[in-house]
UniProtKB/Swiss-Prot annotation:
Active-site feature positions: 329 (nucleophile), 427
InterPro entries: Class_I_gatase-like, CobQ/CobB/MinD/ParA_Nub-bd_dom, CobQ_GATase1, CobQ_N, CobQ_synth, GATase_3, P-loop_NTPase
GATase cobBQ-type domain ranges (all copies): 248-435
Key word Glycosyltransferase present: no
Name of the protein in its database record: Cobyric acid synthase
Gene that produces this protein: cobQ
PANTHER family (alphabetical): COBYRIC ACID SYNTHASE (PTHR21343:SF1), DETHIOBIOTIN SYNTHETASE (PTHR21343)
Membership in a protein family: Belongs to the CobB/CobQ family. CobQ subfamily.
Chain coiled-coil ranges: none
Length: 488
């Protein structure tokens, strides 16, 4: 069994993407590889085959390894529900919410879960490909660390350090990070990878030579900047757009402070006939064909934020003029009359008035609903697959006109009688080509082009593996991964 870890000098250095690439590259060598991230902090999560939730980046990495996502791939998931606190998910199940100070004291327990998952994966797969979190050189977080060097030291694994040259200061990032590590941690760094390089590599070569002489460690390779890579973002909302056709549907998404699973919108961002616009604080909602209320980790506070920005009146005006409104998960709950949180799961206990657009109420309960589902939209009877991640139980007369009929016999969501409003608990709606096309037609787009989002993601994973083979020292990678030359 071999474990190789990728750590980064900063957040968004390219760790998730590199681990995805290495997982697919390893499978090309005939090696059964499994992705692993000890601790992840993200509001984008995926439902696993064993009925839990993990970070979506690990689900993409599982696809790269031709595996079904499993909770052992991300044993500790932190989902922020305030500026200072987060829901703590261990082995796919929410166990508690706590602030940062309390979680610091909880890390020893979390580390037990991390090591147990790693032990199980190590027993089942010859290669475990690990992604760190943030930077290993965060001085204030090093005590009790379970996400970076604390984990690497515990399991005695080598580390590759990646840095993003596109943001500038790449040599300072690499050397500075190395200098802030202990001698034993420095020894674990087996090489550097520079990410997102544009230009002539010959102009960079003197810097690479200096880096190797200064540190005594090799540069494993320089990965180019890839303009049209469309894997799901782990944290920030990706607002890049593809080139659009002449016939375009205008879709607007208000960005809420606790927005969750914003990867729901990636297929729309890539659709050639959709103009997707995210609206931030202080911005007015522009004229649109479709407004989508996204998922939320804190529905009541996000409702207050929506109102404070004047978006409620904009939504009502949008409906008056015939526009369509879609609510997903927390967005569905906002469409109703009341949201009750008697246990204080998402803040102070209490109730908040919803938008009152559909006749139902939602009560938040401690047990979260986690499942992958299949079914058919009420719109056009279109086939859909997706996943549920929610703590709310919704009841009321509006549910009699369901939005989705699930294969397990349940009905999901609701529609307005006039057909302008559609709400569902299902994430991933737009990843199903037929369901996406039906929703876009409902919103006013005709002659819809169906887009194979899963196919696009698979293509990009293959491209990443190609970049590894072309730009990295695969001989050193084989050595670090314990892959013999005859494995492929």
């Amino acid at each position: 069994m071999t474990t190789l870890m990728v750590q980064g000098t900063t957040s968004d250095a390219g760790k998730s993407t590199l681990v995805t690439a290495l997982c697919r590259w390893a499978t090309r060598q005939g090696v059964a590889v499994v992705p692993f991230k000890p601790q992840n902090m993200a509001l984008n999560s995926a439902v696993t085959a064993d009925g839990g939730e993990i970070g979506r980046a690990q689900a993409v990495q599982a696809q790269a390894a031709f595996l079904e996502p499993h909770t052992d791939m991300n044993p500790v998931l932190l989902k922020p529900n305030s500026d200072t606190g987060a829901q703590v998910i261990i082995h796919g199940r929410a166990v508690t919410s706590m602030n940062a100070v309390a979680y610091h004291d909880y890390k020893a327990i979390a580390m037990q879960a991390v090591l147990a998952s790693h032990e199980r994966l190590s027993a089942a797969y010859p290669l475990v490909m690990v992604e760190g979190a943030g930077s290993p050189a965060e001085i204030n977080l090093r005590a009790g660390d379970i996400a970076n060097m604390g984990f690497a030291e515990a399991v005695d694994c080598p580390v590759l350090l990646i840095a993003d040259i596109n943001r500038g200061g790449v040599f300072a990032h690499l050397v500075g990070t190395l200098e802030l590590l202990s001698p034993s941690e420095q020894a674990r760094i087996k090489g550097f990878i520079i990410n997102r390089f544009r230009g002539d590599i010959a102009l960079l070569q003197p810097g690479l030579d200096w880096l190797e002489q200064r540190t005594g460690k090799p540069v494993v390779g320089v990965l180019p900047y890839v303009m049209d890579l469309h894997l799901e973002a782990e944290d920030g909302i990706d607002q890049r757009q593809t080139d659009k056709a002449e016939q375009v549907l205008k879709v607007v998404v208000p960005v809420l402070p606790r927005i969750s699973n914003h990867t729901d919108f990636d297929p729309l961002r890539l659709h050639p006939q959709v103009d997707l616009q995210f609206i931030g604080p202080g911005q007015a909602i522009p004229p649109a064909d479709l407004i989508i209320l996204p998922g939320s980790k804190s529905v009541r506070s996000d409702l207050a934020y929506l109102r404070a920005n004047g978006w409620e009146s904009a939504i009502r005006r949008h409906l008056r003029y015939g526009g369509k409104l879609l609510g997903i998960c927390g967005g569905l709950q906002m469409l109703g009359e009341q949201v009750h949180d008697p246990l204080g799961l998402e803040g102070a206990p209490g109730s908040s008035a919803g938008l009152g657009l559909l006749a139902f109420e939602t009560q938040l309960e401690a047990e979260k609903q986690l499942r992958n589902v299949r079914g058919r939209l009420a719109l056009e009877d279109a086939e859909v697959s997706g996943y549920e991640i929610h703590a709310g139980v919704t009841t009321g007369a509006a549910l009699e006109k369901a939005a989705v009929h699930l294969d397990d016999g349940r009905c999901d969501g609701a529609q307005s009688l006039d057909g302008q409003i559609f709400g569902t608990y299902l994430h991933g709606l737009f990843e199903s080509p037929a369901a996406s096309a039906a929703l876009l037609r409902w919103a006013g787009l005709y002659d819809v082009q169906e887009v194979d989002y899963h196919g696009l993601r698979e293509r990009d994973i293959e491209r990443l593996a190609d970049l590894v083979e072309k730009h990295l020292d695969t001989g050193l990678l084989r050595e670090l991964c314990g892959i013999s030359p005859c494995s492929s």
